[in-house]
């Protein structure tokens, strides 16, 4: 069988069009360079080496043997070879870029919101055939695409006689016709949607009739036409949902923390109230110290392993020891009655249960076919993870650089830990056992969500722990001598220092970002949508020196630093030592330290000349100061410590980390002492430089940096892609997100336009997620009472009310705010569970301050918030649930 592929593409001189046939083995492709005589029409022939019934493929553009462009990879072309007698296929394709409605092709829609059963196309026994294919992603559950056209075979424009097409791929429909039954080589037709509830009332596609002129065919020929996408007069889909961490869930069955069983129960509540999305926070293992400090869900020790705290013990076999079962039940009731999570006791108890269960059931489970299948599919990450956990516990620290041995993971260890006959295997197999059950339960929750047509939305953290598996096993991918964070923003005036290592993108890009692709594909096993945490990090990351505590001394990496001559070109007389070393004068010390100024002069700084000082070598970095004040918690000690931090960051420029001859203006330095000491004309010159650097100079550069990375990542899976694009957002972020069809995050109290106090919800882009608050923010009720002047302005200018704003926030007003968000044009309106609860004064938690999940300004925050109601109680609140459903229905959301 020969396949002749044809495609029109206007190439420029030196470019070639390449056919890439996917083999089904990872990302392997077979390439065929196509031929052309006019630079516009390209063709090539391909003869499959083995008997195949289906081919998936895409086209790309190459120059000098290097790919410079390719089609949208999420939905490659699909050719079903359904004509049994065909000896030659003639295929007419068209180039497919990422469509404007790419979200409809995501698994969030095809598997959840508009799930339909796809069928294998039937074989055709025609001597000559024509296959028509069209993409029609707007169809809803239960609907069918019908081809209706001229001639008897196409139904003579009679809907009842139209040809029902087969959905052979997600949102792509096909039909194979017998050419001998056609009355004319000219086909004229249109597509229509048939809803089984209204079978005689078709919805016709937009536009004129379609026409296809068949070429001269001979027996054994099959011609295939890939047609342009069909569009129908349907409003864009809009969905509502809830955001809540899994650890915050509470049910009658919980063991002091939300688990994967509770996730199923929460899916029930979401579905029962007309919501279609449930968003959670990261669920990967974060066990570093074994203390409550591990409660931070964004500092995972593995990008694959799930956190053991989420295991639902009720889904596991019971312990044979009934006395121990009774003891665990007593402890479960006690922990579940607490208003917040006791992270340490919960995790200790769950591991005790799992250890005992492993002794009882482990040997049999590890021999089962189900486990062997799981192990074979996951051993590449599972074995290093188990080894890391084993050595972490053996040596009493996750800092592998401090281990007396095994500071690197060897292939020999991998082999030994993969072989069930070795002693090492038996030592680490407990972790295989735990991850097997976690994976099984999370898969079960995902399948349950699909059955309820609820989209599970996950969260991809921007960073990884420097004391984790990936840093241990794959250090080449990371810059372990730096720290990732964020510049100052509404969450933290000193910036944020997350402590994560930054990525070595040169190495990652060299292998096609395989590390990221595998990470996303693993996540797609559990979720159908995801949030990219801090998407700005793919443009540039805020990189902080390893010896810094706060984020103020960071710089964007990569970015275009400034030379001394460039700085002078803005009218600022650059003086390297003065402007790159901490500016410490007598008046600065007096203002910062007040009654402690004398102590600081005597102990922590030394005089350089006149009234100018420098830090003593023992305290000249923030990490040294941190170590000196470790364990000192008095108000005076904290005053001095934080004051020393501020002295060290009081510089006008920071040196480029890679090129010491380049400089970056220190972020937010306009609020610091060295800026205050400048002459007015120098301040003006610096501000010109500062604004150009942060908002214009790097825009094109950062755009190209993001486009090296993000296209590969967002096309690695079919999950719906959303991004957290808050903070210091350069213009290029919107360019990339629009180009890649990534949903933005819109928060009315944090508008993208810096000239506005509040965003206009009616101007939200459709491709966006609208929310009131995130886990890093005050809840709606907290925010309402934090700044009376601000909320009065909101009450008057946004809610259009002329009287005084009521405090605390009444339920009726919370309902109006929720309604406004639901009515926005945003595709998704996802509200925190706390903000949903704010509409009911009887049900909501009396203490609004107890609803806060995280305080970003506090790097040692304890993440322990839990629902104050059980999910079972929530399901029984019929009036509240009816109100939620009414608000959603009135907004027109599905």
For each of these PLM feature ranges, what is it?
Residues 101-131, 178-181, 211-894:
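Catalytic cores of glycan-processing enzymes that make or break glycosidic bonds
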Residues 1-5, 128-132:
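Structural beta-strand segments of beta-rich domains
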Residues 91-95, 100:
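Boundary detector for helix-to-coil junctions that initiate low-complexity/charged tails
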Residues 9, 23, 136-138, 149-151, ...:
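Generic secondary-structure microfeatures
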Residues 88-89, 221:
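Terminal low-complexity/IDR "tail" segments
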Residues 2, 8-52, 62-83, 138-186, ...:
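Aromatic-rich carbohydrate-binding modules that target alpha-glucans
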Residues 6, 20, 60, 80, ...:
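Residues in well-ordered beta-strands of folded domains
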């Amino acid at each position: 069988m020969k396949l002749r592929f044809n495609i029109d593409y206007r190439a420029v001189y030196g470019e070639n069009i390449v056919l890439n046939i996917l083999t089904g083995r990872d990302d392997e492709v077979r390439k065929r360079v196509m031929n052309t005589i006019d630079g516009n029409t390209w063709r090539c022939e391909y003869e499959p080496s083995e008997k195949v019934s289906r081919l998936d493929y895409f086209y790309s553009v190459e120059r000098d043997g290097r790919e410079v462009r390719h089609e949208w990879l999420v939905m490659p072309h699909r050719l079903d070879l359904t004509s049994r007698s065909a000896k030659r296929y003639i295929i007419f394709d068209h180039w497919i870029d990422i469509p404007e409605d790419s979200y409809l092709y995501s698994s969030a829609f095809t598997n959840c919101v508009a799930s339909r059963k796809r069928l294998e196309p039937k074989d055709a026994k025609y001597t000559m055939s024509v296959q028509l294919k069209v993409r029609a992603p707007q169809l809803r559950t239960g609907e069918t695409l019908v081809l209706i056209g001229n001639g008897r075979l196409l139904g003579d424009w009679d809907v009842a006689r139209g040809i029902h097409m087969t959905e052979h791929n997600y949102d792509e429909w096909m039909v194979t016709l017998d050419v001998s039954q056609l009355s004319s080589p000219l086909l004229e037709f249109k597509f229509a949607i048939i809803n089984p509830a209204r079978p005689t009332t078709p919805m016709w596609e937009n536009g004129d009739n379609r026409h296809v002129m068949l070429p001269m065919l001979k027996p054994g020929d099959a011609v295939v036409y890939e047609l342009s996408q069909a569009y129908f007069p349907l409003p864009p889909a809009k969905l509502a949902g809830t955001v809540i961490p899994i650890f915050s869930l509470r049910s009658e069955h919980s063991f002091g923390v939300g688990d994967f069983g509770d996730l199923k129960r929460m899916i029930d509540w979401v579905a029962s109230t007309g919501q279609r999305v449930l968003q959670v926070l990261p669920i990967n293992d974060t066990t570093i110290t074994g203390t409550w400090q591990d409660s931070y869900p964004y500092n995972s020790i593995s990008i694959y392993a799930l956190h053991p705290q989420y295991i639902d013990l009720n889904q596991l076999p019971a312990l044979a020891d009934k006395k121990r079962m009774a003891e665990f039940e007593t402890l479960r009731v006690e922990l579940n009655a607490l208003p917040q999570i006791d992270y340490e006791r919960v995790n200790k108890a769950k591991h005790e249960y799992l250890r005992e269960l492993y002794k009882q059931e482990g040997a049999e489970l590890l021999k089962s076919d189900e486990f062997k299948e799981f192990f074979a599919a996951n051993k590449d990450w599972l074995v290093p993870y188990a080894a890391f956990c084993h050595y972490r516990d053996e040596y009493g620290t996750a800092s592998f650089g401090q281990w007396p041995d095994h500071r690197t993971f060897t292939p020999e260890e991998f082999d030994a830990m993969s072989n069930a006959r070795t002693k090492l295997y038996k030592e680490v197999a407990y972790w295989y056992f735990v991850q097997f059950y976690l994976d099984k339960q999370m898969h079960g929750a995902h399948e349950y969500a699909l059955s309820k047509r609820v989209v599970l939305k996950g969260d991809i953290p921007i960073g990884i722990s420097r004391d984790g598996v990936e840093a241990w096993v794959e250090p080449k991918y990371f810059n372990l001598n730096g720290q990732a964070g964020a510049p100052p923003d509404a969450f933290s005036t000193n910036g944020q220092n997350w402590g994560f290592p930054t990525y070595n993108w040169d190495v990652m890009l060299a292998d096609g970002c395989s590390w990221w692709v595998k990470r996303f594909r693993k996540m797609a096993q559990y979720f159908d949508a995801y949030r990219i945490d801090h998407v700005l990090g793919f443009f540039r990351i805020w990189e902080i020196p390893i010896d810094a505590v706060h984020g103020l001394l960071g710089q964007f990496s990569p970015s275009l630093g400034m030379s001394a001559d460039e700085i002078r070109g803005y009218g600022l007389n650059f003086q390297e030592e003065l402007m790159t070393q901490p500016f410490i004068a007598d008046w600065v010390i007096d203002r910062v330290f007040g009654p402690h100024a004398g102590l600081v002069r005597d102990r922590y700084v030394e005089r350089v000349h006149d009234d100018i000082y420098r830090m003593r070598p023992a305290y000249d970095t923030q990490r040294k100061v941190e170590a000196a004040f470790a364990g000192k918690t008095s108000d005076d000690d904290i005053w001095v410590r934080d004051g020393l931090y501020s002295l060290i960051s009081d510089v006008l420029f920071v040196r480029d980390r890679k090129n010491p001859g380049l400089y970056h203006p220190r972020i937010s330095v306009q609020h610091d002492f060295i800026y205050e000491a400048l002459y007015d004309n120098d301040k003006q010159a610096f501000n010109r430089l500062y604004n150009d650097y942060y908002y214009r100079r790097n825009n094109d550069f950062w755009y190209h940096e993001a486009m090296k990375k993000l296209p590969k990542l967002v096309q690695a899976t079919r999950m719906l892609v959303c991004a957290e694009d808050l903070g210091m957002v350069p213009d290029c972020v919107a360019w990339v997100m629009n180009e890649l069809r990534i949903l933005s995050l819109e928060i009315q109290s944090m508008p993208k336009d810096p000239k506005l106090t509040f965003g206009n919800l009616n101007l939200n882009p459709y491709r966006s997620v609208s929310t009131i608050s995130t886990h890093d923010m005050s809840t709606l009720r907290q925010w309402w009472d934090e700044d009376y002047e601000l909320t009065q302005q909101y009450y008057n200018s946004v809610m259009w009310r002329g009287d005084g704003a009521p405090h605390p926030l009444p339920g009726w007003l919370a309902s109006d705010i929720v309604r406004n968000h639901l009515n926005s044009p945003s595709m998704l309106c996802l509200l925190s569970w706390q903000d949903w609860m704010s509409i009911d004064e009887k049900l909501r938690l009396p203490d609004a301050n107890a609803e806060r999940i995280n305080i970003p300004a506090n790097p040692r925050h304890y993440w322990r918030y839990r629902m104050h109601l059980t999910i079972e109680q929530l399901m029984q609140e019929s009036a509240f649930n009816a109100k939620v459903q009414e608000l959603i229905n009135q907004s027109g959301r599905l």
